Every structure is written in C-alpha cells, then in structure tokens.
Swiss-Prot record:
EC numbers for this chain: 2.3.1.31
Pathway as given in its UniProt record: Amino-acid biosynthesis; L-methionine biosynthesis via de novo pathway; O-acetyl-L-homoserine from L-homoserine: step 1/1
The protein's name in its UniProt record: Homoserine O-acetyltransferase
Presence of the UniProt keyword ATP-binding in the record: no
Amino acid sequence: MPIKIQSDLPAKAELEEENIFVMDENRAISQNIRPLEIIVLNLMPIKQDTELQLLRGLSNTPLQIDVTFLQMSSHVSKNTSASHIKKFYQTFEEIKNNNYDGMIITGAPVEKLDFEEVNYWDELITVMEWSNKHVTSTIHICWGAQAGLYYHYGIKKELLPKKLSGVYKHRVMNRKEPLVRGFDDVFMAPHSRYTQASRQQILDNPRLKVLADSDEAGIYIVLGDGGKEIFVMGHPEYDRLTLDQEYKRDIDKGIEPDLPVNYYPDDDCNRKPLLSWRSHANNLYTNWLNYYVYQITPYDLNESYDNYCI
C-alpha cells in the first residue's frame, strides 16, 4: 500500500530503505484514485519511533493512504522536539471540520494515573466524541484502548500486580468477524502495560465483542458497535527491539523489571530478540483498512457520516 506523507518526514528515508512504497504530494496528485484519509493521534513519548512503526503497518495493502498526525495541544512533549511536532503534526482546531476514513489512537505511558488526572484528558475526550461523527472506524492501542473503552462504554481499568511485558500467545474467539480473517488459531502479540480494562465489564457489555484472548495477557482485541471502535490491548505496532529498549530503560531507572516473556532466545537479554508477531500485525491493519474502513467509508468525505459509519 503506498502511503502519502510529507516529503521531508524523517521516517520516509528509512521506509524507502525497507522497500516500503511511499510517495510525496506531487506524485499522489497525479493518481486518479482517492486515498484513504487516516488520522493518527500519537500519544507515545518518542513520536518518531511510533510514526515509523505505524507507517510500516499501514503499508501492506494495495490502497493509497494519506496520513495526518494529530497532537494534543494541552500537552507539551518532553521527548520529541517542538520543531518536529510543529512541522509534522496538526492540532484539533486545525482538523476538527474534516472527515476521515480511519483513525488510530496510540498508547501512552500514563496508565497508573486515573484517566481524569491525565493532563490532556479533556482534549482527548473531545477528540473521541468528535470521531463519532467524523471518522468511519477508530482503532485504539494499549492505553488508548483502555481510554476508549472507558469513555465510550464506561469500562474501568485495573492495576495489575506487576508490569505485563513480553510476547504472549493469543487465540481467536470469533472467526466470523472479518477483523480476524487470516489469523492463525494461536498467534503472538506483544504487551507492555501496568493496567488492564476490566475483563468482567467487557464480557457483560452486549455492545462489545471479544475477538482474541490470552490466558496470560487477558483480552486482546475487542470490537465495539460492529467495528465503529476497535480496541487492541497490546502493541502490535512494536518493532523487534521496542520491548528490549523499554526493558533496559527500566533497568537504568532502577525499576528492576522482570525479563519480557517469550522474547529473548533462551531468556538471554544479550541476544537478538525474536520477532514473532509481524505477520499478525500486518494482517490486523490490512483487515481493519479493508473491511471496516475501505468497504464502509463514503467516496466523498464531505457526505454525511451518519449514513456510512458502522
């Protein structure tokens, strides 16, 4: 899938080195195919890493995608330069009158705070409310999934006894849903979190459907209102070394973390980690874009979304 991005976005060069098809604005204009308009609310601290991870994941289906990155104006990033955010990110005020085919809300390292204690919570719920009328389908990742479940469905989050970190086995729970089409019966996916959405509250809500579950990591994928909202509790976008970097960062902070599960060969943190979830992640993004975005969204984004949202 070709992705249209700004010509000078830092991720562009690395994507091209990996033979991922990206195009700049000039080339995209010459094509007579409407791209899918995807907006990414990037709440992760090192935004360039998440940009690259998500763009990789979105690059594997045969449709052109136009990606817009969204920031929270009420939060000042400590790990990404203001110049990068100013150059490559839009504010909500700048995009609030637009419609989008799809939206991704990322995770954020704020799990131990109550939702209302997060300094951009009010702005985030404004964005989530706006998405009901302006976005065909939204996929929420990790803390973004917990926040979305809390806002849209009142699902509370719970503090885990210790950090859940590693790559865990999951099983498909509902084969009839297109989102899990092509998934193996048992597949691997990474997690890195201190909290979880209440399992019982999810199971008790008739508007929510569990599509993938894990004995060790808990509920993984939840479908809301037939696909209007999708909640992914882990981090399928993570690169091979992301958990490694987080683990060593925690050691440097004196946290004494447990070794990520099912990650290092022979549990040796000096060896190259195993990448066992890439095909699952690619399948997840492809199915979302195809079945919950492309086949649902109006060709003319100016049309009323009341007639098209799932």
